[in-house]
């Protein structure tokens, strides 16, 4: 399994905009090898907010196929030259190979 984590820090009050964008139906769901997309919101009382999007793939090759796909590239070209939203403070993307998974008793 291969995982991409996209951590976005946004100004206070704007996490919902990011959550809405990454929770909406899109073309990625049709991509072969996609396991799931999970959207997480950091529990903060006040101040800047953090949203993490975890995208799980069957393999790194499946992720690479997505990155090179016409649909993915077209999406980036459509946004080329557009300024980033003013509420977006930073974005960090990290890639991981899953080395172990332990199952709990949930849904058993």
Curated annotation (Swiss-Prot):
One of its GO terms (biological process) is heme catabolic process. Residues 2-95 form the ABM domain. Its EC number is 1.14.14.18. The record marks 66 as: Transition state stabilizer. GO terms for cellular component: cytoplasm. It is found in: Cytoplasm. Disulfide bonds: none annotated. Pfam families: ABM (PF03992). This is Heme-degrading monooxygenase HmoA. It comes from Bacillus subtilis (strain 168). The gene is hmoA.
